[in-house]
């Protein structure tokens, strides 16, 4: 059946798109497959912002075979001139006869215009094939392009009884090496990494990506620091390993803000007496930071959850029992007064990492019910 074949080819396009996870920001992940007479003759995916799009890679590989072919693409072909030309026009010029699209592009510069160009040129267009999977593929891009805010993922490592440290503050290491390595792989695919000032004062972290099999990329480091207390001799202020942003309140001493800037750090003011996380996310989104991995403590985590800013959670759970009424948990603060207010996850996935378990899920939104 044609419908089954279309789904099979679209699944391949989505699989190709995933090859560039973490590398295309602020662009979406896109894969394309060219099919002629029932067989794949060319494939492509968007590799990095500013480089050719998936359709162009696939068309270049197909050459003359593109004429009369069907092209499967995981996102509506673009219709505007940016750093590259419009893919919809490239498809028309290549002479393809049919284009199958997983989902329309919500980017206002596209938003149906690519489909319109194709149809006006006489190309048959089919939409909505594996649309749900295509949405999941581009969860980061969709959040950023529709709200202007980064996609926020909260990552935590805890014991089986929900502790992120002992009552005495010891936390290295609760989870095993495989879990920690998976955490570095997450750093590699997010634009930014966010912590609170207390994490910096206690641990002096580098917040860099350390991978064995390939050279990872370091995310932009973001610190919530209402009073600009970040030590000038900390790793974040001295190692030069990555762009570092310190988010302060308007009440932060001007001398401290100036000292941070003199050390080469970027200072963002968001909020009056403490950092307003919603205002901060709007600023970061405007800076084209499309995704943020949060590795903060319980108070930072709760502030983001309470503000409705968290989109995904990664929880690494070790089979250890720590106990202690004063031992810290992944979510502190005032907490939610009623169960109905609790943040619920959906689309849960689990992975076994030796004896540890990684649980991840999307935060359930009321409008999804």
Where on the chain are the PLM-derived regions?
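Enzymes that bind and transform nitrogen-containing heteroaromatic metabolites
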Residues: 2-27, 83, 151-152, 158-369
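A short, flexible N-terminal coil/short beta segment enriched in small residues
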Residues: 13-17, 37-44, 133-146, 235-242
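Proteins enriched for Cys/Gly/acidic motifs involved in redox and nucleic-acid/cofactor modification
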Residues: 22-26, 115, 129-157
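Helix-turn-helix
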Residues: 31
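Zn2+-dependent cytidine deaminase-like catalytic core
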Residues: 34-133, 220, 240, 245, ...
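Short capping loops/turns at secondary-structure boundaries
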Residues: 107-111, 127-130, 145-149, 172-176
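Generic structural signal for helix capping and beta-alpha/helix-loop junctions
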Residues: 108-109, 135, 301, 323
